[in-house]
Amino acid sequence: MRVAFVTTIDDEAIEDDVDLDLEKLAFAAAGLELHLAPWEDESVEWTSFDLVVVRTPWNYVEHLPAFRRWLAGLDATTRLWNPAPVIEWNLDKRYLLDLSSRGVAIVPTAYIDSVAEFRDSVSSIETGEFILKPSISAGSRLTGRFSVGDPHAESLAMQIIGAGLIVMVQPLASSVDHLGEIGTVVFDGEVSHSFRKGPILASGGELIGGAYREDISPIRAPDDVLALVREASAVATDHLRAMQWMGRDEELLYARFDVVRLDDRSPALLEAELFEPCFFLPTDPAAVDRFVTAVLARLAG
């Protein structure tokens, strides 16, 4: 059977894909014919594949209108996972509001679209530092960590608003500096593996070391973190089914949930990535086989 991974023609955007080599080997071993298909390539016949899996279209933020047109223009017979309406919902991090309204603990987040609102939001932060980013972003683009009163924060907020985007303001969870984030990958509704993500952002709007580098290591996620991940996964799936963006009995093919500990030590969801997450498969030798099993089940369905 023929499976397409949706990727991009921008080689630089995907040069840090740590999953692909393992995926190629595992798919071949399972007898699957894997093709890398850039979303920008108009010659690709998406309906010719038995399954189309969105994996690394990591330049979509810079080409958002075109990416959305591509997504909307896919033939209804294309077997796309995760489905196009799910991707459209997950593009904008305001999806956190949907999860929070259904009881999922999230990192406190203000969504603002004016400088005046930004000033009011920052003035209420008690932790001393906060994270600022657009609601549509990837790879820490237009993202910064700032102290309250840092003028560079307002400059970044103005840049985001000027680009027609919504600004997200989140009080810094100080645990990130020593505990990092815990990412957990779910395949076909079942937890696969977890990993630790070290801090990336330095105070003052800079990146640690001056460049975007992810510090990833394997970890056994604590029970309370896994409980939150399972809750978030179930709530998201129920919401997507209720919206009729997935079938009544369908699971997401894949998802990744990033969790931090708040200053009261409770876990809180930072992001739920449902369409282009890195799985960091090298952190668990069995993870790639779980992914292939999920793909095979989807092909058999």
Where are these regions (language model features)?
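Short acidic/polar capping segments at secondary-structure boundaries
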Residues: 10, 85-87, 113-117, 135-139, ...
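ATP-grasp fold ATP-binding core
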Residues: 99-100, 126-143, 165-178, 195
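Structural detector of well-ordered beta-strand residues that form the stable sheet scaffold
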Residues: 52, 80-81, 107, 131, ...
